[in-house]
């Protein structure tokens, strides 16, 4: 029993994954970003350019880039309604941040609008200077 507790303590001490809180800025089936991409935006200039591409003519949400950054996933074009992307979790391991996201697809039996959609999810997180990796979660 004592050995098991020691092994668990050593394992947990080496496991530095820490969940990162995030707040949704924008999430819908519509974006003017037509290509699939994942982004980590760290400057006001990058944010202005991305927002202008994503939602031209719409008010740009304020982000304090001295404290925060924006992370986003754009799926690119989909041939019908019913697609969605969701950032489901963000974890930090030292200087590396891993963003997990999931694409939700319509069921074969769903009745769908025949319209091209561009699903996206943009979130605000605490600023980091480390690498940001993206991992697509499988269903």
Predicted regions and their residues:
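Exposed, flexible binding/inhibitory loops of compact, secreted disulfide-stabilized domains
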Residues: 2-139
């Amino acid at each position: 029993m004592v050995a098991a507790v020691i092994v668990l303590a050593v394992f947990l001490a080496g496991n530095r994954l820490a969940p990162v809180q995030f707040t949704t800025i924008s999430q819908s089936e519509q974006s003017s970003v037509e290509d699939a991409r994942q982004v980590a935006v760290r400057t006001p200039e990058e944010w202005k350019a991305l927002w202008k591409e994503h939602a031209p003519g719409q008010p740009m949400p304020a982000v304090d880039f001295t404290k925060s950054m924006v992370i986003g996933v754009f799926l690119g074009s989909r041939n019908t309604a019913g697609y969605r992307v969701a950032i489901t979790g963000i974890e930090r391991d030292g200087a590396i941040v891993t963003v997990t996201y999931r694409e939700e697809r319509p069921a074969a039996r769903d009745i769908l609008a025949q319209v091209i959609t561009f699903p996206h999810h943009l979130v605000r997180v605490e600023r980091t200077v480390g690498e940001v990796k993206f991992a697509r979660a499988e269903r």
